[in-house]
């Protein structure tokens, strides 16, 4: 077992009840272009086209053969593009239940599948996009070979769903999906199942080729970047792949039914949610519809993903992200506070002892307010308190801010994704957002070396 001692469990109100309910019915779903790092789409549909679930919507020009398939049947109502015609979303109005079927196998056959059989089904169904690489967090090329594959079956993000609750609903499908993963490279590459040390994820009998790694401690103990760092670290010449536990369920369903499984069980939670709980919805769900009559009055920000590293869901991207397993809702913090810096701050939280809210175990109604403007980095040891990885965070963040990619690479930035620096952003006295800085550095390193 690996114990994470440095980090932070955010004391945020609105913790979800770990019981699954049916969410609001949604009649719109979307694929979000921003989810796929570096992807350039070659569109296979137009507005007004009627599509089946599992039909190809677009292909990656930079990664030929990697296709992105419709999460529902219906009509393509809008293809949203932003600046420089960057794809924002492909929106489908859900109609009917027509779907494309793929090759199915008996459960007893899964352990003897060839790598080619597994790969073909994943590619044709679009489930190849469940994999992401580290470094760079991109959908892997079809000819890429990783050092290992990580399955993340734990989540320490604030307000997250408990994977154990979800996996009890799909125990057989999860096991089938894990078996399929062991066959992707004919059993030649290790598959690591990372779980909470206290969780009772059903894996009996043991699956050949699956190695279980247990983690405990504070967030980011549940991030895949943490798992990779301690189990099979990556570098400039070494790549691993990872995917989440609900995509493993979908893979198991695909191979045993021949159908694309697009259900998602997510956490709908946060200070502004009336009844925080786990809800059953679908991949790419319209979040305005999903959260209708679920939120407290006022101006709210709906986030696809975690409050620490998720994306604001509004306008053309008002949809559940491909990799998001939670929807978080905060009040917009637009109110100005006169002399707030000299107040005791019993209703505020800080990792430093500058406010009364630091003491005790109270949960706080966090808002989107950052309580200050962006300014220079202030190295007071805050980053070191929340960074459990074997890197020097202050120096790394300085290099990212300065655009020094050579030094940043030497300090370990290739191991990281935006979510791995989210706590550094949260505790930064200078209110700097290090996620975009990291992404800019990674893009430059990938392009220039």
From Swiss-Prot:
SS bond list: none
Known catalytic reactions: a ubiquinone + n Na(+)(in) + NADH + H(+) = a ubiquinol + n Na(+)(out) + NAD(+)
EC number: 7.2.1.1
Leading EC class: translocase
InterPro entries: NqrA, NQRA_2nd, NqrA_C_domain, NQRA_N
Domain of life (superkingdom): Bacteria
One GO term of the biological process aspect: sodium ion transport
GO-annotated molecular function: oxidoreductase activity, acting on NAD(P)H, quinone or similar compound as acceptor
Pfam family, any one: NQRA_SLBB
Alphabetized UniProt keyword annotations: Ion transport, NAD, Sodium, Sodium transport, Translocase, Transport, Ubiquinone
Similarity comment text for this entry: Belongs to the NqrA family.
PANTHER family given in the database record: NA(+)-TRANSLOCATING NADH-QUINONE REDUCTASE SUBUNIT A
NCBIfam families referenced in this protein's UniProt entry, alphabetically: nqrA (TIGR01936), PRK05352.1-2 (NF003759)
Record note on quaternary structure: Composed of six subunits; NqrA, NqrB, NqrC, NqrD, NqrE and NqrF.
The protein's role, per its UniProt record: NQR complex catalyzes the reduction of ubiquinone-1 to ubiquinol by two successive reactions, coupled with the transport of Na(+) ions from the cytoplasm to the periplasm. NqrA to NqrE are probably involved in the second step, the conversion of ubisemiquinone to ubiquinol.
Name used for this protein in its record: Na(+)-translocating NADH-quinone reductase subunit A
Gene source species: Actinobacillus pleuropneumoniae serotype 5b (strain L20)
Gene of this entry: nqrA
């Amino acid at each position: 077992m690996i114990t994470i001692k440095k980090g932070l469990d955010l004391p945020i109100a609105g913790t979800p009840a770990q019981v699954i309910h049916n969410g609001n019915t949604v009649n719109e779903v979307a694929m979000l272009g921003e989810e796929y790092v570096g992807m350039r789409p070659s569109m296979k549909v137009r507005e007004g086209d009627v599509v089946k679930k599992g039909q190809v919507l677009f292909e990656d020009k930079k990664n030929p053969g990697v296709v992105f398939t419709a999460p529902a049947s219906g009509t393509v109502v809008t293809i949203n593009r932003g600046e420089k015609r960057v794809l924002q979303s492909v929106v489908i109005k859900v109609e009917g239940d027509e779907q494309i079927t793929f090759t199915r196998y008996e459960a007893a056959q899964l352990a003897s599948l060839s790598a080619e059989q597994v790969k073909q089904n994943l590619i044709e169904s679009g489930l190849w996009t469940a994999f992401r690489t580290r470094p760079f967090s991109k959908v892997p090329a079809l000819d890429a070979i990783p050092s290992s594959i990580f399955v993340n079956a734990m989540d320490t993000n604030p307000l997250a769903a408990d994977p154990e609750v979800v996996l009890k609903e799909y125990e057989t499908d999860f096991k089938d999906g894990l078996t399929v993963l062991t066959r992707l490279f004919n059993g030649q590459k290790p598959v690591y199942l990372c779980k909470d040390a206290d969780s009772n994820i059903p894996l009996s009998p043991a699956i050949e080729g699956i190695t279980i790694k247990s983690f405990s401690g504070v967030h980011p103990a549940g991030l895949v970047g943490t798992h990779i760092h301690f189990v099979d670290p990556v570098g400039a010449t070494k790549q691993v792949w990872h995917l989440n536990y609900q995509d493993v369920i979908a893979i198991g369903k695909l191979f045993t039914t021949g159908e694309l499984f697009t259900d998602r069980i997510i956490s709908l939670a946060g200070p502004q949610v009336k009844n925080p709980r786990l809800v059953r919805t679908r991949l790419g769900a319209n979040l305005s519809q999903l959260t209708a009559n679920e939120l407290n009055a006022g101006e709210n920000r709906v986030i696809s993903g975690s409050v620490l590293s998720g994306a604001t869901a509004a306008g053309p991207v008002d949809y559940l992200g491909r990799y998001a397993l939670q929807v978080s809702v905060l009040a917009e913090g637009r109110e100005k506070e006169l002399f707030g810096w000299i107040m005791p701050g019993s209703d505020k939280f800080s990792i430093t002892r500058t406010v009364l809210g630091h003491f005790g175990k109270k949960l706080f109604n966090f808002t989107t307010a950052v309580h200050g403007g962006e300014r220079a980095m202030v190295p007071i040891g805050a980053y070191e308190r929340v960074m459990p990885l074997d890197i020097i965070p202050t120096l790394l963040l300085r290099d990212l801010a300065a655009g020094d990619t050579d030094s940043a690479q030497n300090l370990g930035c290739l191991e990281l994704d935006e979510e791995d620096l989210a706590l550094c952003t949260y505790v930064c006295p200078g209110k700097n957002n290090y996620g975009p800085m990291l992404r800019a550095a990674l893009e430059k390193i990938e392009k220039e070396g």
